[in-house]
Amino acid sequence: LGDVYKRQDKDHVSGVTGLLDRLDVDTLLLPEGEDDAGPQEAVLSAAGAHGAAVRFITAEERLDFGRGTLTVYPPVGDAGDNERGLSVLASAGENDLLITGDMDAATEKKLLETFDLPDIEALVAGHHGSKYATSQALLDAVRPETACISVGSNSYGHPTEETLLRLARQGCGIYRTDLHGTIHLSWNQEESHG
């Protein structure tokens, strides 16, 4: 199993090391560059201890998995670990899921300017539903039908009302891990969206 580690931040390191403990990870994909928060060494050490190869992403890469593909986009932001993470487009047939990580609206704009993103069926809302992510420009460009928000109890107010309203105005079905628990998405292979 390959794993994509979208960005190197303290609040994400334990998740990666936990996955390495539980899953047989062949290759770990990481954003190239130094990390501001300092966890890169811990991730590299954990990958080595579990026998996982590490590949740094510097250009768009497409990985085929049977009837599905992952398109991994390199960092497009300039400052801060949130802006220098990987983005991932998971595709199966005519269905697409986009994960932008914790990037803000300015970096989402750069992502849209740099890569040709399709209309998507599902979006993992950026930065746990922060008001600074999941911009209207991104929603207008990729037109998601479903939004998933990975969030737990926090002191930041995530997800924010602004983000929830943007998603509702877009017509998205909204699913939140804090309210709904683990979210499973599946598509009927016979079904076609477009």
Indicate residue ranges for each PLM-predicted region.
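Non-globular, low-confidence helical/coil segments that flank catalytic cores
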Residues: 3-194
